[in-house]
């Protein structure tokens, strides 16, 4: 074996010993690089005669081609080995049982809101909607809240650092009553000039915001307020609506209602509404579930209506609290933490 055959054998051995592309490139440099062994052979031809250069050059070029062929073959072998390793790592066992696709579900509070809308819808109530950033006027003034009322303070209400076009302060709505005001004013304007105004029956469900957070309060919570305005609407109608609603919502007739005198700036007289179950884990306990009352004449006037002619009642309840009562949940914050282990129980 001459020196060139020995060189080819050495290159083939080094290429075969390389187990990674980086090692193979290092081996290539030792034989085919600028300072490699083949390059050194070419440089050594300077002292040869023209005939010797011709013969020697042809032999060296043949040797270089054999080394390059060995290099290409090893590159392909390493690439194939890498591909096979990747395929093995990503192999899919088609005999394994399939994974069931996860099925989503409505949030329990969303279920409650839908249920509230369905029940009141069956009683002829419309559903109002409105902005979550409201003016101070719609949130407080229109509802007969005096300027010095504690609810207007930044300790209770989230104010936005800007005013509306009329210069009135803006805030995150602390209740959904502003939607009732907007609805009633639009209703009054739509039927202006008519001898008789069609009754206003509307509920206003949605998110509200207050500076409060504990096991039974959240800075963001849901509220549903209702309004029924007409010429002959009384507390008797309010009691009838509440009785039908709560018995339908909790799916039981074994339920009592109690109205306790209270105070709200926007109603007069006002009453808290309690319910008591005749059976079940809450049997015998009076539970506060809503506030209500006859709409204050000043509020009726702000609706754009004549309080001497039109009368009615308003009420407000917390869908979050109703959800807690319905499902036996003690901590309101669980509904808003996004823990699927908790929420998946309500599918």
Swiss-Prot record:
Matching CDD domains: PheRS_alpha_core
Species of provenance: Leptothrix cholodnii (strain ATCC 51168 / LMG 8142 / SP-6) (Leptothrix discophora (strain SP-6))
InterPro entries: aa-tRNA-synth_II, aa-tRNA-synth_II/BPL/LPL, Phe-tRNA-synth_IIc_asu, Phe-tRNA_ligase_II_N, Phe_tRNA_ligase_alpha1_bac, Phenylalanyl-tRNA_Synthase, tRNA-bd_arm
Protein name listed in UniProt: Phenylalanine--tRNA ligase alpha subunit
The protein's Enzyme Commission number: 6.1.1.20
Cofactor binding, note field: Binds 2 magnesium ions per tetramer.
GO function term, MF aspect, one: ATP binding
Catalysed reactions listed for this entry: tRNA(Phe) + L-phenylalanine + ATP = L-phenylalanyl-tRNA(Phe) + AMP + diphosphate + H(+)
Oligomeric form and interacting partners: Tetramer of two alpha and two beta subunits.
Residues holding Mg(2+): 268
Cofactor requirement: Mg(2+)
A Gene Ontology BP annotation from the UniProt entry: phenylalanyl-tRNA aminoacylation
CC per GO annotation: cytoplasm
Keywords in alphabetical order: Aminoacyl-tRNA synthetase, ATP-binding, Cytoplasm, Ligase, Magnesium, Metal-binding, Nucleotide-binding, Protein biosynthesis
Family statement drawn from the similarity comment of this UniProt entry: Belongs to the class-II aminoacyl-tRNA synthetase family. Phe-tRNA synthetase alpha subunit type 1 subfamily.
Subcellular localization: Cytoplasm
PROSITE patterns: AA_TRNA_LIGASE_II (PS50862)
UniProt-listed PANTHER family: PHENYLALANINE--TRNA LIGASE, MITOCHONDRIAL (PTHR11538:SF41), PHENYLALANYL-TRNA SYNTHETASE (PTHR11538)
Tagged with keyword Signal: no
């Amino acid at each position: 074996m001459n020196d060139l055959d020995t060189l080819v054998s050495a290159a083939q051995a080094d290429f075969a010993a390389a187990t990674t592309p980086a090692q193979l490139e290092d081996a290539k440099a030792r034989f085919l690089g600028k300072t490699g062994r083949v390059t050194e052979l070419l440089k050594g031809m300077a002292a040869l005669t023209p005939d010797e250069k011709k013969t020697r050059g042809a032999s060296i070029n043949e040797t270089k081609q054999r080394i390059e062929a060995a290099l290409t073959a090893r590159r392909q072998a390493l690439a194939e080995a890498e591909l096979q390793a990747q395929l093995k790592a990503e192999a899919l066992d088609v005999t394994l049982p399939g994974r069931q696709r996860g099925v989503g579900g409505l949030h329990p509070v969303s279920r409650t809101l839908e249920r509230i809308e369905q029940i009141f819808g069956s009683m002829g109530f419309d559903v109002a909607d409105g902005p979550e950033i409201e003016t101070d006027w719609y949130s407080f003034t229109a509802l007969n809240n005096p300027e010095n009322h504690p609810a207007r303070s930044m300790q209770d209400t989230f104010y936005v650092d800007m005013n509306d076009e009329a210069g009135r302060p803006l805030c995150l709505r602390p209740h959904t009553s502003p939607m009732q005001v907007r609805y009633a004013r639009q209703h009054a304007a739509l039927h202006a000039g008519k001898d008789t105004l069609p009754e206003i029956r509307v509920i206003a469900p949605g998110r509200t915001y207050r500076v409060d957070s504990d096991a039974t309060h959240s800075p963001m919570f849901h509220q549903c307020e209702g309004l029924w305005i007409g010429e002959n609407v009384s507390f008797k109608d309010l009691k009838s609506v509440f009785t039908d609603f709560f018995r339908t919502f909790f799916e039981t007739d074994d339920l009592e209602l109690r109205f306790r005198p209270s105070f709200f700036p926007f109603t007069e007289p006002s009453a808290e509404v309690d319910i008591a179950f005749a059976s079940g884990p809450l049997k015998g306990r009076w539970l506060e579930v809503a506030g209500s009352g006859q709409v204050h004449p000043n509020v009726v006037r702000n609706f754009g209506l004549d309080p001497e002619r039109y009368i009615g009642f308003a009420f407000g309840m917390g869908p979050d609290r109703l959800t807690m009562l319905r499902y036996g949940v003690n901590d309101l914050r669980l509904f808003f933490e996004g823990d699927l282990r908790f929420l998946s129980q309500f599918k």
